[in-house]
Amino acid sequence: MARIRFRGCPITQFASILPQQGANPPRAKGVVNLSTKKLGENSVLDTLLQSGSSKCLFPRASAQGLDAVLLNTAGGVTGGDSFRFTANAAEGTTLTLTTQACERAYKAQPRPYAQISNHLTVSSGARLNWLPQETILFNGSALDRRLQIEMDPDATMLLVEPLVFGRAAMGETLTDIRLRDRIEILRDGAPAFLDAMRFSGDLQAHLCRPHVANGAGAMALVVFASATAEGQLAPVRHLLPDTAGASLIQNDMLVIRMLAKTSFALRRALMPVLRRLNNDTLPRCWML
């Protein structure tokens, strides 16, 4: 275990210990816990803990708040891997979270799932932007992913979760996958939004149904929870392609669902929407 300081913030880093010879092959594990604080008018890093295959990078500070870039040094996830991320946007701060690259869910062994667990809290008067790049599902993958966001009543939150079904450039189709995906948003301790998906088997056949995805190769969910959400509905609808829709599920919560033929088409359609909902800014990682 090592303790260092970064920009005045204490950082704890743990070294991974590999199993003894003859044990099962080591699986990738990673943990990142971070929190922000207010320093004058700026949002800055308060605490950071990182271990294993998870790392967190911090571009230069900006007037928009603190940006953090998550990195999986294992290059992807497969059966038996475990990644946990926790972040707290403290009162009055702005925190933007993204990933350095697309996450890849590789072919897994028959039994274990790859586990990804993300838990975010947004305190009073704070804003959190959860803007990971696409997760790409490979044929044979097994992924169990959970995202929980806890918000104070006057907090603001923007999230996007893009999902890509196979490697289109290689002609890959998802005929055998296992997927469990759950997104939960709590406001003042009460459930405000829940989206859950569970699938096992031939996903490609399911996606090809006209009433499901009509052969789409990628999809995304966007949620904007803010006192200004209602005023964003009409402008956002104007930006959407024919394969997307937006609605208010509460006066202060806007939900967008989007389908696209390819991951490139999905990102190209998402970018103007995210810019609109994020004060005309996006992390550099998102640039085409």
Q: What does each model-found stretch correspond to?
A:
Residues 2-134, 139, 275:
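N-terminal, charged/glycine-rich beta-strand/loop interface patches
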Residues 28, 50, 114, 141, ...:
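A short, structural micro-pattern
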Residues 32, 83, 116-118, 126, ...:
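One face of beta-strands
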Residues 54-58, 106-111, 140-142, 168-172, ...:
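A short, polar/proline- and glycine-enriched secondary-structure boundary/capping micro-motif
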Residues 89-91, 99-101, 122-124, 132-134, ...:
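Short, structured patches in soluble enzyme cores that scaffold and shape functional sites
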Residues 94-96, 127-129, 156-158, 220-221, ...:
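Structural motif
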Residues 111-173:
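Internal, conserved structured core segments that host functional sites
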Residues 163-288:
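A structural signal for small-residue-enriched, beta-sheet-centric alpha/beta enzyme cores
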